[in-house]
Amino acid sequence: MEYEKKYIHSSQLFVAVRPSVIQTVLGSCVAVCLYDSKMQISGMNHYLLPLWNNDGLASPKYGNIAISKLIEAMEAVGCQRRDMVAKLFGGASPNNFNAQNGMLVGEKNIQIAHHILSEQRIKIVASDLGGTRGRKISLESNSGRVMLKYVQKTEF
């Protein structure tokens, strides 16, 4: 099977309705991967910061916006929330990078993903979170399978 390749950057999301491989590289950012096995459709977001503070544009740069928009985009192509499962990746803290208020940005990004997915009743079936190393992930859209490779600090 031939897969279309799609790379997403921070503040982006993508839902694949055709067989695709969606890729991104993460440091303290988090990616939420959603999969609907009935529709065989997947989507991924990549967010930089946990919460939009209602100042400026409500961008998918923020976890609370990015996760909601990803769920909405999946529903827009026919997926049902009750059929979605999630996989979470990222949230690293290389050398305590980006400490705010005593908590690292990566940790806050992880917390918001858990909170929103729990609130939306979307089960988290796999995760690789935290630590000090970045990650490159590749999501096969029609199977929901995620391949993960740890990367060196210089790669993200």
Swiss-Prot record:
GO biological processes: chemotaxis
Keywords, comma-separated and alphabetical: Chemotaxis, Hydrolase
Thylakoid found in the keyword field: no
Pfam families: CheD
Reactions the enzyme catalyzes: L-glutaminyl-[protein] + H2O = L-glutamyl-[protein] + NH4(+)
MF GO annotations: protein-glutamine glutaminase activity
Record-linked InterPro entries: CheD-like_sf, Chemorcpt_Glu_NH3ase_CheD, Cytotoxic_necrot_fac-like_cat
EC number(s) given by UniProt: 3.5.1.44
SUPFAM superfamilies reported for this sequence: CNF1/YfiH-like putative cysteine hydrolases
Keyword Hydrolase among UniProt keywords: yes
Record function comment: Probably deamidates glutamine residues to glutamate on methyl-accepting chemotaxis receptors (MCPs), playing an important role in chemotaxis.
Similarity comment: family membership: Belongs to the CheD family.
UniProt protein name: Probable chemoreceptor glutamine deamidase CheD
Species this chain originates from: Sulfurimonas denitrificans (strain ATCC 33889 / DSM 1251) (Thiomicrospira denitrificans (strain ATCC 33889 / DSM 1251))
